[in-house]
Amino acid sequence: MKIITIWNLKGGTGKTTTTFNLAANLAKDNKMLLLDLDMQANLTSFFDIDTKKYKTNKPDISALLADDSLNVSKSIYHSRIDNIDYIKGSNDVMRLHLEDISVLGSRLSEISQEYDICIIDCHPDASILSENALAIADLVLIPINLDGFSRDNLNLVIKEIIDLEAKCGEINFKILVNKLKNLRSQRLVYKDLAENHDYPMLETSVSEYSGIQSALLRHKPLYMHRSKSLVLSLIHI
């Protein structure tokens, strides 16, 4: 099972939207597992309508990480989208006290043969829970918005990754430009990031599109313009 972790220290960069739509695209050819580590559990809210058909409430990610006697397979929900399963998030994750960065990987190893790809939606922080998700990732995808603070944010993000690499080894990460508008100011920021700094930028970007919010309100994925090229970029990394 390949693991893609969606993470940034900054909120509002489109992590959850990226997770949801990337999973919907990849699910055409892969069996997907989504994991919601954000304490706001927004990814879970996209699928919560599906939980009504279950007679019992399954353990969420907080319960699984707090109690290793729980069966991971019995915590999985099947979504309304073919080939996408998920484990529910919970705001209780903020109260978890994990001992090291191997806990999440250990739990996911129990079901690694059942899925092709797992995508993890992280809370925007540098907690040990986020470190767990970063340490086990085959790819860390960092969505950013192009604004005057992009470089400062990326410097903090990369410092955190470098610090974590001292504990877990090399981390493969790429930067995805999200919510792109055709503005001169954004073009200048992108040029600065791509040409003047050694940031691992994905060539593909995701344009801001009014239909995205409408799709999210309906809890439906949006097959965004150029989303296919984003998926192909990830597959070949």
PLM features: residue spans?
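P-loop NTP-binding core
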Residues: M1-I235
